């Protein structure tokens, strides 16, 4: 049985990486880390900027798929949030997480980063950043994920509601209402 393949000539290293990122996936799906690495080799401006702002915020990506402190394992989710909410909110989310949990591996889980991003988006101009960081620091990020699993709705909203509950705490004067 013959094997069908395409051969491309005269490609630069960057062209090969772009082709790899775009074409691979028919037989085996690329992981988000592999796709991002290929786009970096291809010198894709958006990928370079995304990785640069993430790194400037003090966080790296777990390209190898291994969770570690100060590393985002859920690369695809992070990129989705960056595109959906914009650079400013994406960086603010990273800074809040970094200050609250100091690189804790569980702080960079998809649900947590979705929830924090959703919270700062929904309550923009209403919440106290200092209070949010202080309140989050008192709760392990895995607790947020566990409580969110018992809730209903989208992952971002389930996690945001837990973050809101933590933010409000026992305070009546600093409490924010539930919004969607």
Regions found by a protein language model. Name each.
Residues 2-180:
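Accessory terminal alpha-helical modules
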């Amino acid at each position: 049985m013959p094997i069908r393949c395409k051969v491309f000539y005269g490609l630069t290293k960057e062209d090969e990486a772009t082709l790899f990122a775009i074409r691979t996936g028919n037989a085996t799906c690329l992981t988000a880390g592999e796709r991002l690495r290929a786009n970096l080799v291809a010198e894709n401006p958006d990928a370079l900027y995304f990785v640069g702002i993430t790194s400037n915020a003090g966080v790296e990506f777990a390209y190898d798929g291994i969770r570690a402190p100060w590393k985002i394992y859920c690369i695809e989710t992070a990129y989705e949030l960056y595109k959906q909410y914009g650079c400013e909110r994406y960086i603010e989310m990273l800074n809040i997480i970094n200050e609250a949990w100091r690189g804790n591996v569980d702080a960079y889980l998809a649900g947590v980063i979705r929830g924090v991003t959703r919270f700062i988006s929904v309550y923009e101009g209403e919440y106290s950043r200092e209070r949010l960081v202080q309140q989050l620091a008192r709760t392990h990020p895995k607790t947020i994920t566990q409580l969110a699993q018992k809730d209903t709705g989208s992952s971002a909203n389930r996690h945001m509601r837990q973050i809101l509950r933590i933010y409000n705490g026992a305070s009546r004067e600093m409490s924010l209402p539930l919004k969607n």
